[in-house]
Amino acid sequence: MTDVMYNPEIISKAGVILSSCFIDKKVDYVITVETKGIPLAYEVARNLGVQLVIARRAAQVTEGPTVTINYVSGTSGRLQQMSLSKKSMKPTSRSIFIDDFMKGGGTALGIKELLKEFNSDLVGIGVLVDNKQVAKKLVDEYVSIVELKAVKESSVIDIRPSKMFTKK
């Protein structure tokens, strides 16, 4: 996944695709969680002409006062933390969450809860890869570019274009 996430040509194109899904949402911020999702989120923010905000797994002293929440990982069920500087966002803003990979949706749900602390709305979720091996997600509405259907023992990965590319 790292070879894809840090390839500027691929991420630039993926950023165009995802930003086109949210162009009419009147977004104030693109938010992501450190670290692998940052290049994709940056491209989406750049295309939409809005600020990128990065939530951290642990608060950094250099960021000043922060808001920290606990959330449950959608796949492992483990309790995790997410922090965001109080200066990162204006209240009553509208944000989209962009990430590299969605397993169970726990991180997306955590972002939604974190944004509530800023009186801000999560108006969309976009990911590069949606892991379809996890059937029940903690979030219902999101877009993905590709779907991971299966990883076989022989290291063969079954990845297909997401439903946004298939005719209905």
Predicted regions and their residues:
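PRPP-associated nucleotide enzymes
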Residues: 1-98, 102-168
